[in-house]
């Protein structure tokens, strides 16, 4: 029996680098011989920018233009080929201050199923905006096998990671969803990450170093893999994403996380800042 697609949902604090991480991870998965579809789930519709080099039309825009006649839409109307052979879709979003992001994600999945697109891929990756602030934006977890949380070594990102972990736990009550683990993005230290996972046990898939080219790649509209074609010094950075891809393709058991209570986590992480490890005084 043929294995079904691995479905991943990537979450994290707003601005933490989810889309940059998602695009590089998608290319890494493609380099492992997998057919990959990345679905951007953010009203800004810029998730796939570093794969395609431009802002592709959204599914919601296309549906509106076609009067929501699904039968008039073809795969080439909504699926765009990006770098490394990664296929890209942008869900789009409702007008600012109106509508529900979860509805948009649902319509996107509905259309892709109508087009039999889900059957064409080995990996489907949902790149989801910011923190899980409502049930609507937790909607991609309804379709995912694994959640991946992008963080850094800071208080706010880990606080958001804990809230996302709570959403995973809630969704896991009714479906086979697991947390694959954390990805530390662009950080020179990991002490606060380690402090967090010691209190809230969960896997750490990888911690990427504080490399400026990771940020620059977003501005250039290129993945690290594409930049490495002309700058081989970036190949070791690409290896981090390949390592993550290998871990996810192994279909890990994952976990149902047990997030900390907000006050408990606040105390844990703030105490870390209040009582830093001091260097021994020179005599």
From Swiss-Prot:
Extent of the signal sequence: none
Keyword rRNA-binding: no
Gene3D superfamilies documented for this protein: P-loop containing nucleotide triphosphate hydrolases
Keyword Iron attached: yes
EC number: 1.3.7.7
Binding sites annotated in the UniProt record for Mg(2+): 19
GO molecular function: 4 iron, 4 sulfur cluster binding; ATP binding; metal ion binding; oxidoreductase activity, acting on iron-sulfur proteins as donors; oxidoreductase activity, acting on the CH-CH group of donors, iron-sulfur protein as acceptor
Keywords, sorted A to Z: 4Fe-4S, ATP-binding, Chlorophyll biosynthesis, Iron, Iron-sulfur, Magnesium, Metal-binding, Nucleotide-binding, Oxidoreductase, Photosynthesis
Residues bound to ATP: 15-20, 44, 185-186
Cofactor: [4Fe-4S] cluster
Cofactor note: Binds 1 [4Fe-4S] cluster per dimer.
Domain of life, source organism: Bacteria
Reactions catalysed, as given in the entry: chlorophyllide a + oxidized 2[4Fe-4S]-[ferredoxin] + 2 ADP + 2 phosphate = protochlorophyllide a + reduced 2[4Fe-4S]-[ferredoxin] + 2 ATP + 2 H2O
GO BP: light-independent chlorophyll biosynthetic process; photosynthesis, dark reaction
InterPro entries (UniProt xref): NifH/chlL_CS, NifH/frxC, P-loop_NTPase, Protochlorophyllide_ATP-bd
Residues that hold [4Fe-4S] cluster according to the record: 100, 134
Pfam families from the UniProt entry: Fer4_NifH (PF00142)
Pathway where this protein functions: Porphyrin-containing compound metabolism; chlorophyll biosynthesis (light-independent)
PANTHER family found in the cross-reference section: LIGHT-INDEPENDENT PROTOCHLOROPHYLLIDE REDUCTASE IRON-SULFUR ATP-BINDING PROTEIN
Known role: Component of the dark-operative protochlorophyllide reductase (DPOR) that uses Mg-ATP and reduced ferredoxin to reduce ring D of protochlorophyllide (Pchlide) to form chlorophyllide a (Chlide). This reaction is light-independent. The L component serves as a unique electron donor to the NB-component of the complex, and binds Mg-ATP.
Assembly and interaction partners: Homodimer. Protochlorophyllide reductase is composed of three subunits; ChlL, ChlN and ChlB.
Family: Belongs to the NifH/BchL/ChlL family.
Name listed for the protein in its UniProt record: Light-independent protochlorophyllide reductase iron-sulfur ATP-binding protein
Organism: Synechococcus sp. (strain JA-3-3Ab) (Cyanobacteria bacterium Yellowstone A-Prime)
């Amino acid at each position: 029996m043929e294995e079904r697609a691995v479905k991943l949902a990537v979450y994290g604090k707003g601005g933490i680098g989810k889309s940059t991480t998602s695009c590089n991870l998608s290319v890494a998965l493609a380099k492992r011989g997998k057919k990959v579809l990345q679905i951007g789930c953010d009203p800004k519709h810029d998730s796939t920018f570093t794969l395609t080099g431009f802002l592709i039309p959204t599914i919601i825009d296309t549906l509106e233009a076609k009067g929501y006649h699904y039968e008039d839409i073809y795969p080439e109307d909504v699926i765009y080929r990006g770098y490394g052979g990664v296929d890209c879709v942008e869900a789009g979003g409702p007008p600012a201050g109106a509508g529900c992001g979860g509805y948009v994600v649902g319509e996107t999945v509905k259309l892709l199923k109508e087009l039999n697109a889900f059957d064409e891929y080995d990996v489907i990756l949902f790149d989801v905006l910011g923190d899980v602030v409502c049930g609507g934006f937790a909607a991609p977890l309804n379709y995912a096998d694994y959640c991946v949380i992008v963080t850094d070594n800071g208080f706010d990102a880990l606080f958001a990671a804990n809230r996302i972990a709570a959403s995973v736990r809630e969704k896991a009550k009714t479906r086979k969803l697991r947390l694959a683990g954390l990805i530390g993005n662009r950080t020179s230290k990991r002490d606060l990450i380690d402090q967090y996972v010691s209190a809230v046990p969960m896997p750490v898939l990888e911690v990427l170093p504080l490399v400026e080219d990771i940020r620059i790649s977003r501005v250039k509209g290129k993945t690290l893999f594409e930049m490495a074609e002309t700058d081989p010094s970036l190949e070791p950075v690409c290896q981090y994403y390949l390592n993550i891809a290998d871990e996810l393709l192994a279909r890990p058991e994952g976990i149902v996380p047990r997030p900390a209570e907000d006050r408990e986590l606040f105390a844990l992480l703030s105490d870390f800042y209040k009582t830093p490890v001091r260097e021994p005084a020179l005599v």
